[in-house]
Amino acid sequence: TAYDNGGDFFQNGGAWDTNVSVSGGNKTGNFFLSGSFYDQDGIIPTTGYTKTTFRFNAEQRWKMLTFNANVAYSQARTSKTLTSAGLHDSSGTGSMVALYGWARSDDMKHYLNEDGSKYRIFEGRQELSADVENPYWMLDNYRLKDDTERFTGSFSVKADITDWWWISYRMGVDSYTTENSNR
């Protein structure tokens, strides 16, 4: 029996992007507030990307002064898998390398023995260190995640001394943290 391991392994990917915004203003000021959520499913099972973002911008004029403020915050999560060489116990391959090297005569969906232990396609025929990892087993055991939070903000004030001369002061921050995990 020949199995379509490659065709069965991949899934349809998709992306959804939802945005909401509100803005307003008058002759002396304006504002903009937005929120968004992006969700993407990868073509490899268990993979994807999500991002939530909030943003606020405002400007206010008062006499000779103009104030500006901008703030943005985002949270992003990337769920991925090992696609090529690199992790311990992976025999130097990743899910994509293993997928295209998997024998068509073996059903790749069978990656666990009845007792829950890892199924080895070459059990007893080659050393464990030279074994080929099953891509489905790798998806269950090498779950890589990156979680990133980012904050940006800026503030400025501008003083119009004359119609051709002005002074301004600007300050800002851009800060992020990323946590990586491998389960």
Identify the residue ranges that each predicted region occupies:
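Outer-membrane beta-barrel transmembrane strands
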Residues: 11-29, 36-37, 135-182
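Surface-exposed loop/interface segments of Gram-negative outer-membrane beta-barrel transport/assembly proteins
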Residues: 1, 43-44, 53-150, 168-183
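Periplasmic N-terminal accessory/gating domains of Gram-negative outer-membrane beta-barrel systems
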Residues: 3-13
